[in-house]
């Protein structure tokens, strides 16, 4: 049932010519998902999601990122973000657009 619905949806999408990058019907009845352009993708994608008989293929191998890769991206962007916000706050205060008031001395 799901295979038939996926094939019908693929035929409607491919037949209308609206977007050929979502699903396409391959030779032999296989339904594939992904880009149909000739350019190679840097991200590994899975082109065929259903076998010819209609069975769904098993999950692909998951690639873990690792803490070193995550921190090597997060920390520099956090630092750049703090520099931008600090400089923008100083600019606003310099032009008297926003001057914070210390109202904490109400004791």
Swiss-Prot record:
Which parts pass through the membrane? 66-85
The keyword ATP-binding is assigned to this record: no
**GO terms, biological process:** calcium import into the mitochondrion; mitochondrial calcium ion homeostasis; mitochondrial calcium ion transmembrane transport
- The source's domain of life comes to Eukaryota
Q: Provide the membrane topology annotation.
A: Single-pass membrane protein
Q: How is it modified after translation?
A: Undergoes proteolytic degradation in neurons: degraded by AFG3L2 and SPG7 before SMDT1/EMRE assembly with the uniporter complex, limiting the availability of SMDT1/EMRE for MCU assembly and promoting efficient assembly of gatekeeper subunits with MCU.
User: What spans does the record annotate as topological domain Mitochondrial intermembrane, numbered to this chain?
Assistant: 86-107
> Where can the motif GXXXX[G/A/S] be found?
81-85
Key words of the record: Calcium, Calcium transport, Ion transport, Membrane, Mitochondrion, Mitochondrion inner membrane, Transit peptide, Transmembrane, Transmembrane helix, Transport
The transit peptide extends across: 1-47
Q: Which GO terms describe its cellular component?
A: mitochondrial inner membrane; uniplex complex
Name any one GO molecular function: channel activator activity
Q: Mind telling me which PANTHER family this protein's record contains?
A: ESSENTIAL MCU REGULATOR, MITOCHONDRIAL (PTHR33904:SF1)
Give the multimer and partner information.
Component of the uniplex complex, composed of MCU, EMRE/SMDT1, MICU1 and MICU2 (or MICU3) in a 4:4:1:1 stoichiometry. The number of EMRE/SMDT1 molecules is hovewer variable, ranging from 1 to 4 copies per uniplex complex, leading to uniplex complexes with distinct gatekeeping profiles. Interacts (via its C-terminal poly-Asp tail) with MCUR1; the interaction is direct. Unprocessed form interacts (via transit peptide) with MAIP1.
Print the domain comment field. Answer: The GXXXX[G/A/S] motif at the C-terminal part of the transmembrane region mediates interaction with MCU and is required to activate the calcium-conducting pore in the uniporter complex.
| Described purpose of this protein according to its UniProt entry | Essential regulatory subunit of the mitochondrial calcium uniporter complex (uniplex), a complex that mediates calcium uptake into mitochondria. Required to bridge the calcium-sensing proteins MICU1 with the calcium-conducting subunit MCU. Acts by mediating activation of MCU and retention of MICU1 to the MCU pore, in order to ensure tight regulation of the uniplex complex and appropriate responses to intracellular calcium signaling.
Q: What is this protein called?
A: Essential MCU regulator, mitochondrial
Q: Which organism is it from?
A: Bos taurus
Q: Which gene encodes it?
A: SMDT1
């Amino acid at each position: 049932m799901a295979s038939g619905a996926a094939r019908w949806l693929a035929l409607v999408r491919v037949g209308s010519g609206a977007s050929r990058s979502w699903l396409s019907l391959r030779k032999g009845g296989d339904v594939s998902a992904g880009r149909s352009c000739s350019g190679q993708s840097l991200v590994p994608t899975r082109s065929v999601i259903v076998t010819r008989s209609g069975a769904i293929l098993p999950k692909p191998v998951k690639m873990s990122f690792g803490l070193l890769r995550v921190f090597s991206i997060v920390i520099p962007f956090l630092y750049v973000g703090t520099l931008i916000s600090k400089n923008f706050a100083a600019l606003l205060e310099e032009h008297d657009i926003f001057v914070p008031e210390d109202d904490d001395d109400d004791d």
